[in-house]
Amino acid sequence: MPFEIVFDGAKEFADLIATASNLIDEAAFKVTDEGISMRAMDPSRVVLIDLNLPESIFSKYEVEEEETIGINMDHFKKILKRGKGKDTLILKKGDENFLEITFEGTAKRTFRLPLIDVEELELDLPELPFTAKVVLLGEVLKEAVKDASLVSDAMKFIAKENEFSMRAEGETNEVEIKLTLEDEGLLDIEVEEETKSAYGISYLADMVKGIGKADEVTIRFGNEMPLQMDYFIRDEGKLTFLLAPRVED
């Protein structure tokens, strides 16, 4: 059998895949003896998604040989949603062209997901000269995106010394969410210079859907530069988004 991988906590894994599936229809997952990885671009080429899950976050990780599998993300998401919070998730692939997905909880339920051919693109995650780094609670970011969506289709991020704010302006109203290090929601901020950039709210909304309220989210950005958003899965796994800026006239 090429691989058998076990993850304790089916819902956590499902939330992770659901977040990525909001932005991409299909993906090529690389399964190696070091872990699972995936890098893809959304169809509009506005967001790059990078996922790295090292073997250490799984309770069982057996891989006979390196393999890349193509998956329909919507189908994968719908199956994973059938897992309960405390279910054990088992992913297996044999010699046939399907992924076996098993939930073990009060019963043992097994799905077979056909694998698909996915074009593997050479995508680099660039190291950019960001001038601001902000660490905040997932709940704060999720609520800010919801607030901003009532006003506009774009949200501006502004970082200055010891202060981070998110603003949206419409034709008749506006909203501002401001945080300092005295607020529980802002965990850390590093600013080389006052930094401002705007981003599309529809993309931000998709990016934050799978983030838990207590999760720590790291945001890096520069003046009219892409935004990099990272959040960690069990300390060692990481999901990264790189979002192109909304350039203002």
Curated annotation (Swiss-Prot):
Record protein name field: DNA polymerase sliding clamp
Keywords noted in UniProt: DNA replication, DNA-binding
Pfam families registered for this protein in UniProt: PCNA_C, PCNA_N
Family: Belongs to the PCNA family.
Domain of life assignment: Archaea
CDD domains per record: PCNA
Oligomeric and partner information: Homotrimer. The subunits circularize to form a toroid; DNA passes through its center. Replication factor C (RFC) is required to load the toroid on the DNA.
PROSITE patterns tied to this protein: PCNA_1
Gene Ontology BP term (one): leading strand elongation
MF terms (GO), sorted A to Z: DNA binding; DNA polymerase processivity factor activity
Protein task: Sliding clamp subunit that acts as a moving platform for DNA processing. Responsible for tethering the catalytic subunit of DNA polymerase and other proteins to DNA during high-speed replication.
